Amino acid sequence: MGDVKMDKELLHKKIKKDIEDLINNHPPERTLGNLIPLSIFQAVRIGVLTAGCGIEAIIYNIGKDIGREVISRYVDRDNLLESFAEILKKAKIGILEVKKVEENEMILILKDCISCHNVPNVGTTLCHFEAGLIAGTLEKKLRRKVNAVETKCCGKGDEYCEFLVKIEDKLYW
């Protein structure tokens, strides 16, 4: 069999549209229902993580791209964290709470997180996608370089996920 070239741009547009439709209360129609069971999503997600090969960085960057290109469009810069929390809840990613906000640093809590809710203590953080989503969304809205690192996770036996968000001084765009 010959190599089949995947149309990554078409897939990217499809994912972007599906997320936008979900946020706008128009999820794609499907005979079996619009949502997959959390256990199936987590099985695939954790299966990918166990493959190794630096996949965590890839998952983080996917989250960052989606945050920057999709989620940020629905977040109000003047009401940044509150509107971001609304979007994450609406997209069923998790319930965002603010623990600390300073000029160049935040600590954000994510409860009922899609990647690790009800996961047993496996000894490591699991929410690289959510960390990327936080970084990408805030980076786009603040026009500053942002990095988010998960410091607490249900995958480490914690009750919720916690992210340390570092914001660089330099403005861009």
Swiss-Prot record:
Pfam families: V4R. This is Uncharacterized protein MJ0150. It comes from Methanocaldococcus jannaschii (strain ATCC 43067 / DSM 2661 / JAL-1 / JCM 10045 / NBRC 100440) (Methanococcus jannaschii). InterPro entries: NO_sig/Golgi_transp_ligand-bd (IPR024096), V4R (IPR004096). Belongs to the M.jannaschii MJ0150/MJ0739/MJ0745/MJ1460/MJ1642 family. The lineage of its organism: Archaea, Methanobacteriati, Methanobacteriota, Methanomada group, Methanococci.
